[in-house]
């Protein structure tokens, strides 16, 4: 199943906050949003309004366009992967008779 926009945006926001070494409290105070609500946004449970998303981006000193572009690129990668993966089969999760496995040749065997 494809990721929801709110989940991907939340991942981008959390990644930005963590890369800055900032806490939820710091960003929530700066953006004037409750810590719990910001946490839910980051976890993809809540979808922020455009105004709130802008406030969070301002608190992170990150242009809104950067967040949206990053989220769009992540979603595009997921969509390409989903199209490339045969229906009903998780990527790399199963091996069947049609799976080709390359085994490197053994140069020598040690005898104990």
Curated annotation (Swiss-Prot):
Swiss-Prot/TrEMBL induction comment: Expression requires SigE. Induced by carbonyl cyanide m-chlorophenyl hydrazone (CCCP). Induced in response to thioridazine (THZ).
InterPro entries attached to this UniProt entry: ClgR-like, Cro/C1-type_HTH, Lambda_DNA-bd_dom_sf
Phenotype upon loss of function: Inactivation of the gene increases M.tuberculosis susceptibility to the intramacrophage environment. Deletion mutant shows a significantly reduced ability to arrest the acidification of the phagosome.
SUPFAM superfamilies: lambda repressor-like DNA-binding domains
Keywords annotated in UniProt: DNA-binding, Stress response, Transcription, Transcription regulation
One Gene Ontology term from the biological process aspect of the record: regulation of DNA-templated transcription
Domain HTH cro/C1-type: 13-67
GO terms for MF: DNA binding; sequence-specific DNA binding
Ranges of the DNA-binding region feature: 24-43
Self-association and partners: Interacts with PspA.
Function: Key stress-response regulator that plays an important role in multiple regulatory networks in response to different stress conditions. Involved in preservation of envelope integrity and tolerance to surface stress. Essential for macrophage infection and facilitates intracellular growth of M.tuberculosis. Controls the expression of several protease and chaperone systems, including clpP1, clpP2, clpC1, ptrB, Rv1043c, acr2, clpB, Rv3269 and the clgR-pspA-rv2743c-rv2742c region.
Database matches in NCBIfam families: trans_regClgR
Protein name (Swiss-Prot/TrEMBL): Transcriptional regulator ClgR
Gene source species: Mycobacterium tuberculosis (strain ATCC 25618 / H37Rv)
Gene name linked to the record: clgR
């Amino acid at each position: 199943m494809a990721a929801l926009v709110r989940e991907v945006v939340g991942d981008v926001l959390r990644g930005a906050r963590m890369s800055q070494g900032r806490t939820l409290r710091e960003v929530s105070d700066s953006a004037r949003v409750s810590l719990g609500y910001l946490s839910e946004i980051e976890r993809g449970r809540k979808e922020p309004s455009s105004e709130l998303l802008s406030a969070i981006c301002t608190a992170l000193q990150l242009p809104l366009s950067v967040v949206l572009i990053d989220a769009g690129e992540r979603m595009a990668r997921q969509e390409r992967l989903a199209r490339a993966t045969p229906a009903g089969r998780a990527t790399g999760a199963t091996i069947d008779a049609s799976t080709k496995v390359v085994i490197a040749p053994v140069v020598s065997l040690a005898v104990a």
